[in-house]
Amino acid sequence: MSPQTETKTGVGFKAGVKEYKLNYYTPEYETKDTDILAAFRVTPQPGVPPEEAGAAVAAESSTGTWTTVWTDGLTSLDRYKGRCYDIEPVAGEENQFIAYVAYPLDLFEEGSVTNMFTSIVGNVFGFKALRALRLEDLRIPPAYTKTFQGPPHGIQVERDKLNKYGRPLLGCTIKPKLGLSAKNYGRAVYECLRGGLDFTKDDENVNSQPFMRWRDRFLFCAEALYKAQTETGEIKGHYLNATAGTCEEMMKRAIFARELGVPIVMHDYLTGGFTANTSLAHYCRDNGLLLHIHRAMHAVIDRQKNHGIHFRVLAKALRMSGGDHIHSGTVVGKLEGERDITLGFVDLLRDDFVEKDRSRGIYFTQDWVSLPGVLPVASGGIHVWHMPALTEIFGDDSVLQFGGGTLGHPWGNAPGAVANRVALEACVQARNEGRDLAREGNEIIREASKWSPELAAACEVWKEIKFEFEAMDTL
């Protein structure tokens, strides 16, 4: 043993296992403006005190490990360690609490959502002392936010590119999602766009399969949208899914989309990964492409109330990584989403400054310091009867996406698109005239259907369709 090692172990180091709370539970700590703050819903194993469980989360997601190590003496743990600074019981739950943890900014690489998540949630969720753990919210400080480009363009730039103002944008996912040839797929795109939609969309699992290779799909969809633009005089788009098995292949597809002159591409950001997503977002800004984001796989991560990561955290991460649209649930359709909670993370996507509001699940005040906003996309089981509620809930800065609610029209795709466009224009006009969409919505749709046979047919088909299940995502 060298003299230096002997001195270190003899004077300052004592091997063994210490309780986490001795170093990582610090209720006296005053958080700094530069700290990343996290709110964890913790369910400890029986016999584990809240202070020890909260401290364990702070330790295992920052500088700690299960035993004392002599290299602790070679750095300043007080500077780098995470701290559990507050513990709050969860109302109505016997053995569950919210642990608030502060992380020094120096723990994280600038501009890397990948590194942020690897640190905060990468290892601690498998910790045996915890029965379950859920990351409910993060406060991203301005000092860290400023290291990210964020969305390639943002809401205002997108509206300027499309020359469309004063209403939600309308979209449609092409169905069946798998099995169509590229030419038939392009035909479906054309019919929807000429009928009045702003966008059509590849579904999340449309990549480059044997029945429809990506290059063929891109070419036929570009032909369809240019033809629809010529006929309607409106700028049209189709979300060309660039998601691929490698980043290099993804970028090749995005480059080809740019060469075709189309306005927008798409990425599955969770299955594709944050590193790939951020790379694509940077390319899109540099080359004038809008970026639509699908959240495929999100429910695997966020659906369980006691374990995983809440979608509001994934939404914040997407705004940092980069995307101009992201699917956000509908409140009224077939997919998960309770109204107040959904609107909470919708505000976190769109607004520049969002106050703490626990009634909407927002644990921290969030200042985005002018990072561009993201348009929420309402999609999944919606149809013309939902239009008043969707317009009232999401407002103008949103994309309302009707897949089956367009393609399921008894007269075909173009009449289905007409029905949705007429319903939307009627709702926007009624709202601008001061009418109450929540109370008068059905009447507004019925009035409009008198002047639109396409809307009348859609109203008849979907008059009995409801998705009345209790939301899992509650406070």
UniProtKB/Swiss-Prot annotation:
- Residues in the active site? K175, H294
Q: Which residues carry this modification: N-acetylproline?
A: P3
* Cofactors (names): Mg(2+)
Annotated site location: Transition state stabilizer: K334
> Which keywords does this Swiss-Prot/TrEMBL entry list?
Acetylation, Calvin cycle, Carbon dioxide fixation, Chloroplast, Disulfide bond, Lyase, Magnesium, Metal-binding, Methylation, Monooxygenase, Oxidoreductase, Photorespiration, Photosynthesis, Plastid
Q: Which residues are assigned to the propeptide feature?
A: 1-2
Q: Where in the cell is it found?
A: Plastid, Chloroplast
How is its cofactor bound, per UniProt? Answer: Binds 1 Mg(2+) ion per subunit.
GO terms under cellular component: chloroplast
Question: In Gene Ontology terms, what is a biological process of this protein?
Answer: photorespiration
Quote the catalytic activity from the record. 2 (2R)-3-phosphoglycerate + 2 H(+) = D-ribulose 1,5-bisphosphate + CO2 + H2O; D-ribulose 1,5-bisphosphate + O2 = 2-phosphoglycolate + (2R)-3-phosphoglycerate + 2 H(+)
Q: Which PROSITE patterns match?
A: RUBISCO_LARGE
The protein's matches in Pfam families, at most eight in alphabetical order, are given as: RuBisCO_large, RuBisCO_large_N
Enzyme class name: lyase
InterPro entries under this entry? RuBisCO, RuBisCo_large_chain_AS, RuBisCO_lsu_C, RuBisCO_lsu_C_sf, RuBisCO_lsu_fd_N, RuBisCO_lsu_N_sf, RuBisCO_lsuI
Quote the EC number: 4.1.1.39
Q: Which residues carry this modification: N6,N6,N6-trimethyllysine?
A: K14
Where along the chain is substrate bound?
Answer: N123, T173, K177, R295, H327, S379
List of residues binding Mg(2+):
K201, D203, E204
Post-translational modification here is noted as: The disulfide bond which can form in the large chain dimeric partners within the hexadecamer appears to be associated with oxidative stress and protein turnover.
- Biological function: RuBisCO catalyzes two reactions: the carboxylation of D-ribulose 1,5-bisphosphate, the primary event in carbon dioxide fixation, as well as the oxidative fragmentation of the pentose substrate in the photorespiration process. Both reactions occur simultaneously and in competition at the same active site.
Q: Which NCBIfam families match?
A: PRK04208.1
**Family assignment?**
Belongs to the RuBisCO large chain family. Type I subfamily.
Share any extra remarks: The basic functional RuBisCO is composed of a large chain homodimer in a 'head-to-tail' conformation. In form I RuBisCO this homodimer is arranged in a barrel-like tetramer with the small subunits forming a tetrameric 'cap' on each end of the 'barrel'.
Assembly with partners or alone:
Heterohexadecamer of 8 large chains and 8 small chains; disulfide-linked. The disulfide link is formed within the large subunit homodimers.
Q: What is this protein called?
A: Ribulose bisphosphate carboxylase large chain
| Species of the source | Populus tremuloides (Quaking aspen)
Name the gene behind this protein: rbcL
